[in-house]
Amino acid sequence: MTKEWISLGQLGKPFGIKGWLRLNVRETVLCELKTPISLKLSKPDFHFPEKEITLLEIRPHGGKFIVRFEGVTTPEEAAKWIGGFLFLPQKLLPKIETKNEFYITDLIGLQAIDESGKKLDWKLKDVQDNPAHPILVFVKENGEEILIPFLQVFVGDLDLEKNTIVLIQPEIWNEI
């Protein structure tokens, strides 16, 4: 998937008897968009071809969301889409209003620096959802991954123009 398409989240188990699915959201912008809307569905299964789908409805439910798609009307049909990732054309994203706003996808590839501005050999590879808080997944040049909670106590300023993210006391993560 290219940068023209932004990952919105991953589909979970069916919900109810009318073909709804749970959605683990990566970007909450989906709630701001007018439905119906055309999205791409992709699964990490080579037997499941990427396809364009139409999102008919999205609702908040228990801290997450449930979604309904065109042509999916039973739990059995919905079950085929479990684990699928939803992608939105980047051009449909609402514009960022302030310096402190960003999309998760904008963070991927940021260079880690320490509080003094010293460049670390870590790049941000992914942001994983976690019930308590998001987890930043950094990868070192040697391929080793380092997981850091996305909390103010560990993460300082983000500078999308300079492509950097400040890590507070990064040496503690090297020892773990």
From Swiss-Prot:
Binds ribosomal protein uS19. One of its GO terms (cellular component) is ribosome. Residues 99-174 form the PRC barrel domain. Keywords: Chaperone, Cytoplasm, Ribosome biogenesis, rRNA processing. PANTHER family: RIBOSOME MATURATION FACTOR RIMM. GO terms for biological process: ribosomal small subunit biogenesis; rRNA processing. The PRC barrel domain binds ribosomal protein uS19. It is found in: Cytoplasm. This is Ribosome maturation factor RimM. It comes from Leptospira interrogans serogroup Icterohaemorrhagiae serovar copenhageni (strain Fiocruz L1-130). GO terms for molecular function: ribosome binding. Belongs to the RimM family. Coiled coil: none annotated. SUPFAM superfamilies: PRC-barrel domain, Translation proteins. It comes from the Bacteria. The gene is rimM. Pfam families: PRC_RimM, RimM. Transmembrane segments: none annotated. An accessory protein needed during the final step in the assembly of 30S ribosomal subunit, possibly for assembly of the head region. Essential for efficient processing of 16S rRNA. May be needed both before and after RbfA during the maturation of 16S rRNA. It has affinity for free ribosomal 30S subunits but not for 70S ribosomes.
